[in-house]
């Protein structure tokens, strides 16, 4: 919404060149009343933006007022702004030193969600300033009437009007410039948070050049000195950063060397029990030689027993070394447990195989059969054990009968001796 909607122009006929409002009168009044009661919601602001018509504002008209042959106040202000720059006038009008902090607090906000609320606050501030400037408008009307009585000056020279229309005068009568259609365009300095002090100082520098014959040199020298000091400070900071990086790298290298030294000390302090661990892994697995002759049976069994005894000794040594050795990590302990379990499992299988061989040798029918399966050996050994138990009971009965017969014979012999 343009800032001069509530203040129609009265001095010149530029009203027909103004861009028509984007909304209808009822909708505009509705949004005005709602914004005065409470700030609009973000969703309402967004949809209100999307309802705008895609028509750009018209360029401001350059023709003078029809009521007088002399250039009007707006034309004179346009010439002033062309010479001095329109940004300086807008910034000096909007961004004064008193309201600079207020403008920063209002305008520099989120443009997506709080744009319309900030614009409403800004419009309120501008309307208050325009109301204050209307009071001073009557005073400036006398000076502008004197300027209208004189012939128009060239745009290359500043229209001073005997010193009455200076930079302050442009600030005083800038409300008339805002009524120009070009004021509908938004000033970039209002939307974007540029440093305001720099822009104002840069805008006021041409006026100082006009008043003075020679430009000041102290500002340039001071700025060059400040730039040199900043460069020196940057160099010092870079050097400090490089030194800090070097210190960090040295510390990293020292920590790495310390880790290497600690690892070497720990490896040297650990006792070397690797051959014992290898012995556990290299337990001999003996298979029965089915092609061997029955004559080598006794020697084979004796050699197996000797090797089993040696394996038992090795396991005892491993257990003793574990008790004496320092505690290791969890991975090494798990590996040791797995290896000992494998060794014990192999030993159990070997003992079971030897027991099968011994049982087979006790069965007379399968004694010479080297390829007898384990199931047959177990079955025949059970039958043989049962038969041996029956033989034992039979022999016990026979011995009892023989003892009874012996007792009977002794009694008969005693009777014969007594009869003689």
From Swiss-Prot:
One of its GO terms (molecular function) is DNA-binding transcription factor activity, RNA polymerase II-specific. GO terms for biological process: positive regulation of cell population proliferation; regulation of transcription by RNA polymerase II. Residues 161-172, 319-329 have a biased composition (Polar residues). Residues 143-160 have a biased composition (Low complexity). The keyword Transferase does not apply. It is found in: Nucleus. Residues 395-416 are annotated as: Leucine-zipper. Keywords: Activator, DNA-binding, Nucleus, Transcription, Transcription regulation. SMART domains: HLH. Residues 336-388 form the bHLH domain. InterPro entries: bHLH_dom (IPR011598), HLH_DNA-bd_sf (IPR036638), Myc-LZ (IPR003327), Myc_transcription_factors (IPR050433), Tscrpt_reg_Myc (IPR002418), Tscrpt_reg_Myc_N (IPR012682). Pfam families: HLH, Myc-LZ, Myc_N. Residues 141-181, 203-275, 319-345 are annotated as: Disordered. Residues 225-246 have a biased composition (Acidic residues). Residues 249-262 have a biased composition (Basic and acidic residues). The 9aaTAD motif is a transactivation domain present in a large number of yeast and animal transcription factors. Efficient DNA binding requires dimerization with another bHLH protein. Binds DNA as a heterodimer with MAX. This is Transcriptional regulator Myc-B. It comes from Xenopus laevis.
């Amino acid at each position: 919404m343009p800032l001069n909607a509530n203040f129609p122009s009265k001095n010149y006929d530029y009203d027909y060149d103004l861009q028509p409002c984007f909304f209808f009168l009822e909708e505009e009044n509705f949004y005005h009343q709602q914004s005065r009661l409470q700030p609009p919601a973000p969703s309402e602001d967004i949809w209100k933006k999307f309802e705008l018509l895609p028509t750009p504002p018209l360029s401001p008209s350059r023709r003078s007022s029809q009521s007088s042959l002399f250039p009007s106040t707006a034309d004179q202000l346009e010439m002033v702004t062309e010479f001095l720059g329109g940004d300086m006038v807008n910034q000096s009008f909007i961004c004064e030193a008193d309201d600079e902090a207020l403008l920063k607090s209002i305008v520099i906000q989120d443009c997506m969600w709080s744009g319309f609320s900030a614009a409403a606050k800004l419009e309120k501030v501008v309307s208050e300033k325009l109301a204050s400037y209307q009071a001073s408008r009557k005073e400036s009307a006398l000076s502008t009437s004197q300027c209208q009585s004189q012939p128009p000056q060239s745009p290359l020279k500043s229209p001073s009007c005997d010193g009455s229309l200076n930079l302050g005068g442009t600030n005083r009568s800038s409300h008339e410039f805002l009524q120009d259609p070009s004021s509908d365009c938004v000033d970039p300095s209002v939307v974007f948070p540029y440093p305001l002090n720099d822009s104002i100082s840069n805008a006021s520098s041409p006026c100082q050049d006009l008043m003075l014959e020679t430009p000041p040199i102290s500002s340039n020298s001071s700025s060059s000195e400040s730039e040199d000091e900043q460069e020196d400070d940057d160099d010092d900071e870079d050097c400090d950063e490089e030194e800090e990086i070097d210190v960090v790298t040295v510390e990293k290298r020292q920590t790495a060397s310390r880790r290497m030294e600690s690892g070497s000390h720990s490896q040297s302090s650990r006792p070397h029990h690797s051959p014992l661990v290898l012995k556990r892994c290299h337990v001999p697995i003996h298979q029965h030689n089915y092609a061997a002759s029955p004559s080598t049976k006794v020697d084979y069994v004796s050699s197996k027993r000797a090797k089993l005894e040696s394996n038992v000794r090795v396991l005892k040594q491993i257990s003793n070394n574990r008790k004496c050795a320092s505690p290791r990590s969890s991975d090494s302990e798990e590996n040791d447990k797995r290896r000992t379990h494998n060794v014990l499992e192999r030993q159990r299988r070997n003992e079971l195989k030897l027991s099968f061989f011994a049982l087979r040798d006790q069965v007379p029918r399968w004694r010479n059969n080297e390829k007898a399966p384990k199931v047959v050996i177990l079955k025949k050994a059970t039958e043989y054990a049962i038969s041996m138990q029956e033989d034992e009971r039979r022999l016990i009965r026979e011995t009892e009968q023989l003892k009874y017969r012996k007792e009977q014979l002794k009694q008969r012999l005693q009777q014969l001796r007594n009869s003689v």
